[in-house]
From Swiss-Prot:
PROSITE patterns: MFS (PS50850)
Protein name: Uncharacterized MFS-type transporter MT2531
GO cellular component, one term: plasma membrane
Keyword Nuclease tagged: no
Organism: Mycobacterium tuberculosis (strain CDC 1551 / Oshkosh)
GO molecular function, one term: transmembrane transporter activity
Pfam families the UniProt entry points to: MFS_1
Transmembrane segment boundaries: 51-71, 79-99, 110-130, 163-183, 224-244, 258-278, 289-309, 315-335, 356-376, 379-399
Homology family: Belongs to the major facilitator superfamily.
SUPFAM superfamilies xref list: MFS general substrate transporter
InterPro entries for the chain: MFS (IPR011701), MFS_dom (IPR020846), MFS_trans_sf (IPR036259)
PANTHER family for the chain: MAJOR FACILITATOR SUPERFAMILY (MFS) PROFILE DOMAIN-CONTAINING PROTEIN (PTHR23539:SF1), MFS TRANSPORTER (PTHR23539)
Main location: membrane
Length: 418
C-alpha cells in the first residue's frame, strides 16, 4: 500500500500509518467496554450506563464544531492531536479509581471533548500532506490502518481480560494513546500544507475565501442533508455494539469482555479490506451507491440481532458492522471534502458533520438504554434497524452524487488495465 497511493515521503506515510493504527482505539473511546465494566464490576443498570455513554457524546457534540474551526485556523495540528491523546490517557487511568456516576460522567465528558480533536485533525493532516488528488486513496488507507489498530487492540484486550478482568480495557487505551503521541511527533511540521489542509484550492497570490465562517454551514444544502443522514446512521449504529456486549455479558458473565473483543475483532477484520477498497474505488464508483449499501447493511443488522441470543450468532451478525462502518469511515471525510472543496471550510464543516454523528450516537445510547429497560433488547434492536431504513430512504431521495463526473471518468479503468 505504498508508491503511487500517497504523494508524500515514505517517512510521512509510515507515520500516518502508525498514527491511524494507534489512534484507532483512542478516538473511539472505551465504548462498549465501559458498558461491560460498569455492568459486571459495579452492577450498574442499563439506563445509568446509557446516561454516562450519552454524556461523552454530548460533550463531543458541544466541542466538535469549534474544534473544527480551530483546526482550520491553527498550524499546530500535531500539538492538538498530542493534547487530545494525553487527556484521553489521563481519563482512562482515572476511571477505575473513581467509578461513581458523577465521576464517570465527568471523565466521559473529558474523553468526549479530547477525542473530538482526532477526526478533523487527522483529516486535515492527511489532506495537507497528500492534497485533494490523492485524498480518497489515502483516506482509504488511513481507515484500513485504523481498523487494523482496532482489531489489534481488541485482541489484546480480550487476551488480557481473560487473565486480569475487564479493567484491562483502561490499560490498553492508555498504552495506545501514548503510542499515538510518538507517531504524531514523527510527522515533520513542514510536511503539511496548511492551506490545503483547510480545503483551499487556489494558485499562489490569488484571493480566496476566509476559512471557518459559520454561515457556510447553513447555506450548503448538500452538507445539511449529509448531516441529517449521518445522524440517522449513528443513531441506528452507535448503541448496537454496546447492547450486544451487554447481552453477551449477561449470558457469559465470566467471559463478557473476551466475547466483546471477539465481536470487535470480527468486525474490524472485515473493515480493513472494505475501507481500502472503498478508498481506492470511491472516485470511480461514486459515493452515493456505496453509502446506500452501508445503510442497507445496517438495517439488516438491526433485525438479525433479534433472531437469536446465541453468542456465536451475535458475533456472526457483528461481522456486518465491518461492511457498514468500513464504508462510512472511508466515505465520510470524502463527501465533506466534495461539498466544501475550494472554500477553505473543510475542517469546520467536518467538525459540524462530526457533531451530527455525535448527536446520533448520544441519542442512540440514551434512547436504546431506555427502550431496553421498558421493552427489552429485541425492541431496541428493531427500533434501531427501522431508523437505519429511514436513513437509507433519506440518502436515496435527497442526497445527490457528490464526486465530480470528470473525476469518475478519470478514475475508471480502461480496456488496457489502468
Amino acid at each position: 500500500m505504498s508508491g503511487t497511493v500517497v504523494a508524500v515521503p515514505p517517512r510521512v506515510a509510515r507515520a500516518l500509518d502508525l498514527l491511524n493504527f494507534s489512534l484507532a482505539d483512542v478516538r473511539d473511546g472505551l465504548g462498549p467496554y465501559l458498558s461491560i465494566y460498569l455492568l459486571l464490576i459495579h452492577d450498574w443498570d442499563q439506563a445509568s450506563i446509557g446516561f454516562v455513554m450519552a454524556v461523552g457524546g454530548i460533550a463531543a457534540i458541544v466541542a466538535q464544531t469549534p474544534i473544527g474551526a480551530l483546526v482550520d485556523r491553527t498550524t499546530a495540528k500535531r500539538a492538538l492531536v498530542v493534547a487530545g491523546a494525553v487527556l484521553v490517557t489521563a481519563a482512562a487511568v482515572a476511571m477505575p479509581l473513581f467509578a461513581g456516576l458523577y465521576s464517570i460522567s465527568v471523565l466521559q465528558a473529558v474523553t468526549g471533548i479530547a477525542s473530538s480533536v482526532f477526526a478533523p485533525a487527522l483529516a486535515a493532516i492527511t489532506l495537507g500532506a497528500v492534497g485533494p488528488q490523492f485524498f480518497a486513496r489515502r483516506i482509504g488507507r488511513n481507515e484500513a490502518f485504523n481498523h487494523a489498530g482496532n482489531a489489534s487492540a481488541a485482541g489484546a484486550t480480550g487476551a488480557l481480560a481473560y487473565f486480569f478482568g475487564p479493567v484491562v480495557v483502561f490499560w490498553v487505551l492508555a498504552g495506545m494513546a501514548l503510542i499515538s503521541v510518538l507517531a504524531t511527533l514523527r510527522i515533520p511540521p513542514d510536511a503539511v500544507d496548511h492551506d490545503l489542509a483547510r480545503g483551499m484550492d487556489h494558485a499562489p497570490g490569488e484571493p480566496h475565501p476566509q476559512p471557518s465562517r459559520f454561515t457556510v454551514l447553513a447555506h450548503n444544502r448538500e452538507l445539511v442533508i449529509f448531516g441529517a443522514a449521518v445522524v440517522a446512521f449513528h443513531f441506528a449504529n452507535a448503541a448496537m455494539l454496546p447492547l450486544v456486549g451487554e447481552l453477551l455479558a449477561l449470558h457469559n458473565r465470566d467471559e463478557g469482555t473476551a466475547l466483546m473483543s471477539s465481536c470487535i475483532v470480527a468486525a474490524q477484520v472485515v473493515m480493513v479490506p472494505v475501507a481500502y477498497v472503498v478508498g481506492t474505488r470511491a472516485d470511480a464508483w461514486g459515493r452515493k451507491p456505496i453509502f446506500l449499501v452501508g445503510f442497507a447493511v445496517l438495517t439488516a443488522r438491526g433485525f438479525l440481532y433479534t433472531l437469536s441470543d446465541n453468542s456465536y450468532w451475535l458475533v456472526g451478525v457483528q461481522l456486518l458492522d465491518g461492511i457498514g462502518a468500513g464504508i462510512f469511515g472511508a466515505l465520510f471525510p470524502l463527501v465533506v471534502q466534495d461539498v466544501t472543496h475550494g472554500t477553505g471550510h473543510f475542517n469546520i464543516s467536518l467538525g459540524a458533520v462530526t457533531t451530527a454523528t455525535g448527536i446520533g450516537a448520544a441519542l442512540s445510547n440514551l434512547v436504546a438504554g431506555w427502550i431496553v429497560v421498558v421493552a427489552g433488547y429485541d425492541a431496541a434492536f428493531m427500533s434501531l434497524g427501522a431508523l437505519a431504513g429511514a436513513g437509507f430512504l433519506l440518502y436515496l431521495v435527497a442526497m445527490p452524487e457528490t464526486v465530480d463526473s470528470d473525476v469518475r471518468v478519470r478514475s475508471r479503468p480502461t480496456l488496457g488495465g489502468k
